């Protein structure tokens, strides 16, 4: 085998690889890792049949970031947006667009990120018992209807591509908000003239209350090709297995955010971030990660998201969503 000792896998796909190639990966059982110290949703990706196979690397908890200066123009604050319904957010978005000409937020129209995020915030998946959960999924229907409504009312800008989403809508200063995994922060920070004008909060929900979701992320795994499994386990346990020092350095030097919950108490994570009005956003993100609900995953979730987004776009253009 040409596999390295340790590999990094995207969270959404690792369970299929471990299931299909069980002899290719070494369980992390016996490693000195405080598994209870991680956000449960993040950890769930690397557990197969009750066995730990990976060590989480990063944190992809979704944030909803708002330009507070633009909210103020329509008489709103970040507190008004926290725990709001999507209907409330839509009304604010209409006011923001009328007042400033900016969409409240955007999403990429060539993937299902927004649908997945909104669904997870409701604790519902696109799959059930290994099968697509679409036609009888009332929550999904409401989510898609909400996105159609927001797009028609110029609340949500549906970008034509990932480049359009990143380069035009966010870095082109078209939006008053960003809803995405927190890895989007460096993209936002590239617009330096808006430094200090942003704050983050949780995701709206259909019926109100703070919503939580995660989008993306990866973990580290030991392969059967490893020549010294005990050393590899010790290395992962010492570094990414719960060390606050490792994650303090990773955040300070590389912008890597953790789901190790105790890091929320570290000095580094409690530092105010100038771009976000000197709020300790990384502490907030770690605390949010503890509340992300675990939902059923599938290797086909990306493909399902594309199909669902296509249905949303077709509905915006005049088709019937139920079709």
Task: Label every PLM stretch briefly.
Residues 51-57, 62, 72, 87-133, ...:
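Extracytoplasmic/periplasmic solute-binding protein
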Residues 9-63, 87-92, 98, 117, ...:
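Hinge/lid segment of periplasmic solute-binding proteins
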Residues 1, 12, 84-88, 158-171:
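Short helix-initiation/N-cap motifs at beta->coil->alpha
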Residues 90-95, 131-160, 189, 203:
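Glycine-centered hinge/linker elements that transmit conformational signals in sensory
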Residues 184-194, 207-310:
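C-terminal lobe and pocket-closing loops
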Residues 27-38, 81-82, 124-143, 190-193, ...:
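Short, solvent-exposed loop/beta-turn-alpha elements that line the ligand-binding surface or hinge
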Residues 1-21, 30-35, 78, 207-210, ...:
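Conserved N-terminal structural module of periplasmic/extracytoplasmic solute-binding proteins
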Residues 5-8, 176-181, 199:
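Paired acidic/hydrophobic, glycine-rich loop segments that form the ligand-binding mouth/hinge
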């Amino acid at each position: 085998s040409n596999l390295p000792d340790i590999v990094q896998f995207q969270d959404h796909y690792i369970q299929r690889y471990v299931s299909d190639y069980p002899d290719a990966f070494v369980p992390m059982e016996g490693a000195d890792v405080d598994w209870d110290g991680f956000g449960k949703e993040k950890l769930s990706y690397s557990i197969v049949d009750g066995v730990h196979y990976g060590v989480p690397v990063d944190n992809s908890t979704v944030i909803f970031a708002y330009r507070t200066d633009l909210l103020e123009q329509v008489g709103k604050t970040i507190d008004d947006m926290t725990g709001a319904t999507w209907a409330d957010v839509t009304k604010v978005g209409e006011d923001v667009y009328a007042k400033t000409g900016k969409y409240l937020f955007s999403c990429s129209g060539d993937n299902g990120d927004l649908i997945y995020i909104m669904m997870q915030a409701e604790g519902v998946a696109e799959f059930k018992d290994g099968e697509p959960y679409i036609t009888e999924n009332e929550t999904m229907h409401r989510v898609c209807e909400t996105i159609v409504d927001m797009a028609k009312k110029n609340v949500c800008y549906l970008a034509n591509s990932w480049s359009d989403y990143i380069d035009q809508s966010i870095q082109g200063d078209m939006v008053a908000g960003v809803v995405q995994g927190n890895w989007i922060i460096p993209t936002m920070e590239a617009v330096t003239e808006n430094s200090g004008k942003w704050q983050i909060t949780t995701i709206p929900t259909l019926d109100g209350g703070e919503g939580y979701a995660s989008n993306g992320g990866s973990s580290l795994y030991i392969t059967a090709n490893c020549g010294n499994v005990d050393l590899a386990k010790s290395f992962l346990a010492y570094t990414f297995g719960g060390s606050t020092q490792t994650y303090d350095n990773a955040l300070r030097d590389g912008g890597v955010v953790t789901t190790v919950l105790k890091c929320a108490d570290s000095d580094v994570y409690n530092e105010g971030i100038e771009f976000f009005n000197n709020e300790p956003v990384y502490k907030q993100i770690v605390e949010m990660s503890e509340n992300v609900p675990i939902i059923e995953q599938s290797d086909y979730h990306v493909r399902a998201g594309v199909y669902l987004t296509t249905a949303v776009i077709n509905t915006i253009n005049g088709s019937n969503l139920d079709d």
